[in-house]
Regions:
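N-terminal helical submodule of small eukaryotic multi-pass membrane proteins
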Residues: 30-110
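Interfacial segments of alpha-helical transmembrane regions
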Residues: 34-46, 129-166
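Interhelical loop segments of eukaryotic multi-pass membrane proteins
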Residues: 59-84, 126-138, 182-190, 224-233
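Juxtamembrane loop segments immediately following a transmembrane helix
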Residues: 138-140, 168-202
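Physicochemical signature of membrane-embedded alpha-helices that form the seven-helix bundle of GPCRs
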Residues: 42-48, 97-111, 159-170, 194-205
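Intrinsically disordered, low-complexity domain-flanking/linker segments in eukaryotic proteins
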Residues: 9-20, 123-153, 235-241
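Hydrophobic residues within the alpha-helical transmembrane core of Major Facilitator Superfamily
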Residues: 51-53, 169, 214
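Terminal transmembrane helical module of multi-pass membrane proteins
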Residues: 190-245
Length: 245
């Protein structure tokens, strides 16, 4: 006959509560799109200029010299059409479709930027923190500060801005490469100084600032995907995408 041994106390109940996640698996924070005011100001300046340019292109020949719509809105294009023949009578008479095709893409690009600004102002908030990729607020002041949009709207804003900026840079590079591979057919007649101040500098702005936007929004998208994938990210601070709650 087998006897059972008595125990001085009962066995403890098993702990069924989930264990707390380790710091490497859980972090207190959230992703956010944090464009600097520099980005926003660039868009507020460039969009009217692009609309002006697109209007000239799509309303030719009425917007060209001698046309009923030329004065006073598009008078400066009298000079620019002599600097760059792609905007002048030469390309128009030759039925060169590049100018109008680029103007059509300008419309799509501008609508994307307008939708982006709508998201920023309808769902975002201004912050004194430094925007990602922006100069320090101690030196740049307001230009370096950010607008903050988190959640799905922030992700959508970053995606739209990245796509539009890639479109801007690609379209501008195509414009430059078209000249290079045609032997500078439309701008080769200019002096070096005229070329620098009337063509390279004005058009170069649409390479520099959108490239900055690609860097900023691309970094944000990459970091957001890294967070979702469970990868390590930099610790959060005022300029990071992961905002501490």
């Amino acid at each position: 006959m087998v006897s059972t041994r008595g125990h001085p106390q009962e066995f403890p109940e098993p702990d069924l509560t989930p264990s707390r996640a380790t710091p490497s698996r859980a972090r207190k924070g959230k992703w956010a799109h944090t464009p600097s005011n520099l980005t926003i100001i660039w868009l507020l300046i460039s969009l009217p200029l692009v609309a002006w340019d697109t209007g000239y292109v799509m309303l030719r020949p009425h917007s060209m010299p001698g046309g009923s719509l030329h004065w006073p809105i598009w008078v400066p294009y009298d000079l620019y059409g002599q600097v760059d023949y792609i905007y002048g009578w030469k390309a128009f008479h030759e039925k060169n479709g590049f100018t109008a095709a680029q103007g059509f893409l300008n419309i799509i690009e501008s609508l994307m930027y307008l939708y982006y600004l709508y998201i920023l102002y309808a769902f975002g908030a201004q912050s004194r923190a430094q925007g990602r990729g922006a100069p320090k607020t101690s030196t740049a002041g307001f230009l370096g500060q950010q607008r903050y949009v988190d959640g799905q709207k922030g992700a959508l804003a970053a995606l739209v801005a990245f796509s539009a900026a890639v479109m801007t840079v690609s379209k501008t590079l195509l414009y430059w490469m078209n000249e290079y591979y045609s032997g500078f057919e439309n701008i080769g007649h200019n002096s070096l100084m005229d070329l620098i101040f009337l063509w390279i500098i004005p058009n170069g702005a649409w390479l520099v600032l959108p490239s900055y936007m690609i860097y900023v929004t691309g970094s944000e998208i990459l970091q957001g995907l890294t967070i979702v994938a469970g990868g390590a990210t930099a610790s959060s601070d005022d300029t990071a995408l992961v905002k501490t709650e």
